[in-house]
Amino acid sequence: MSYGGGYGSSRDHYGGGGGGGYSRGGGYGNGYGNSNGYSHGHSSGGYGSYGGAGGYGGGTGGDRMSNLGAGLKTQNWDLSTMPKFEKSFYKEHPNVSQRSTHEVDAFRKEHEITVQGKNVPRPVETFDEAGFPQYVMSEVKAQGFARPTAIQAQGWPMALSGRDVVGIAETGSGKTLTYCLPAIVHINAQPLLAPGDGPIVLVLAPTRELAVQIQTEITKFGKSSRIRNTCVYGGVPKGPQIRDLTRGVEVCIATPGRLIDMLEAGKTNLRRVTYLVLDEADRMLDMGFEPQIRKIVSQIRPDRQTCMWSATWPKDVRQLAQDFLHDYIQVNIGSMDLSANHRITQIVEIVSEFEKRDRMAKHLDRIMEANKHSKVLIFTGTKRVADDITRFLRQDGWPALSIHGDKQQNERDWVLNEFKTGKSPIMVATDVASRGIDVRDITHVLNYDYPNNSEDYVHRIGRTGRAGAKGTAITLFTTDNAKQARDLVAILSESKQQIDPRLAEMARYGSGGGGNRWGGRGRGRGGFTASNAAPLGNNRRW
């Protein structure tokens, strides 16, 4: 069988443009001041200090700018006037049709496949059963793959059917090919690009590294039908990327900020996009890209096909799926129970509220002695506590900095850069502010305050143990948190962690607690002249 393969011959393939690296761009505004007028750093935008006025310079730029997309026009979609397009290509193979429901269920159980939604297609067990056209299959066979992975076996029929799809699977599960091969089929069924047309397939990814990896796969499997692509990300010159977009590409793989730059500058448009992919959606939200994603999606016709992929399924990712996808079908690989990364050692200590500071300091001492290159992310329940313990740590000689919603954006970027580079190996954060944190080499997470729910606990500790590394999560748990004990014990048990007998007792008998001692919102505005500018004590550490 074939899928609209008649367009391939007129395409000239070229690999995407632009080398270089992913970055936020534009400088960090790297100055700050205290009462002595201390200021330092660098920035393309300039900064200064006199008489204690901290130097904010440079701004953020690149993929971090919160006002990106302000210049994009609101689209009023009238689908009755828009050209129709094909998106349903799946025809079930006879071998698949002949399998009994029992056989299908057994296959899904064996491969830990769970599906949700109406009329989910049956999984395929071989590449031939997926029904890809020869121009795709020739390259698949050339790669020497033995059989589809679990996510591919179930995901290919779903994506080829033209339905909106959510896929939840660990990194390394083969999800990139799960959406790339149907994307190639989709492109070859559409009219050729005309001059001035934007891409047909748009893939949004959180980082340059992932975007380049996706581009490699698209290039490999799209070359037989001469599909052109480009990779658009910040921190590198725009020229080569603009050149590619101007020539015309069927596939654009992009990080959100740089794509909005291109759209605002009129270098491309999304009018032809009919196949949208959000890859690593959870990580894009972690990095604070939700506003940019929403602005981009608003520029795409609403009857598109959308495929959303994520390693986890927290409530903010679920909300994104509800907003962007229509009547979607979902595939999950592995358990859907709330579980923590098994590479993370979880230590939960029962303490009283007034013991927390000393206990935290002792842990930092041990961490420092074991490895001076450690990075520690400390979570608090409120902005006030974040500032309080940052001052406490700095006065005790620890180079700690805090990040929360009352800090100005350029200060938050500066703090994050100090933490990423290891100049300040301790960062104190609230849950909301942590959405912009994407640091791969965090060795320890310390929960100074326990979060409001177990999902946030798993999300917090997941900041360590990334990319195959091991990590440690330390949690200070008080009687005020007793109502969370049962859920916490379940998470610890699932990941085979040691459980403090007192915590187990709380789980058996505990009920509601009084919440955090501080309660409420933090008061006052943060700033370089506040907690982050508190002088380091004489007992310098780290």
Swiss-Prot record:
Q: Where is the Helicase ATP-binding domain?
A: 156-331
Keyword Nucleus recorded = yes
Q: InterPro entries, alphabetically?
A: DEAD/DEAH_box_helicase_dom, Helicase_ATP-bd, Helicase_C-like, P-loop_NTPase, RNA-helicase_DEAD-box_CS, RNA_helicase_DEAD_Q_motif
- Helicase C-terminal domain location, by residue? 346-507
- Main localization (coarse): cytoplasm
GO molecular function ontology, one term from the record: ATP binding
Any GO BP: rRNA processing
SMART domains cross-referenced by the UniProt entry: DEXDc, HELICc
Region named Disordered: 514-542
Q: Which UniProt keywords apply?
A: ATP-binding, Cytoplasm, Helicase, Hydrolase, Nonsense-mediated mRNA decay, Nucleotide-binding, Nucleus, Ribosome biogenesis, RNA-binding, rRNA processing
**UniProt motif (DEAD box) ranges:** 279-282
**Superkingdom:** Eukaryota
Q: Which residues bind ATP?
A: 169-176
Name where it's found.
Cytoplasm; Nucleus
In what ranges is there compositional bias, type Gly residues? 514-527
PANTHER family for the chain: ATP-DEPENDENT RNA HELICASE DBP3
Query: What is its quaternary makeup?
Result: Associates with polysomes.
Biological function:
ATP-dependent RNA helicase involved nonsense-mediated mRNA decay and ribosome biogenesis through rRNA processing.
Task: Kindly provide the name given to this protein in its UniProt entry.
Answer: ATP-dependent RNA helicase DBP2
Q: What is the species of this protein?
A: Ajellomyces capsulatus (strain NAm1 / WU24)
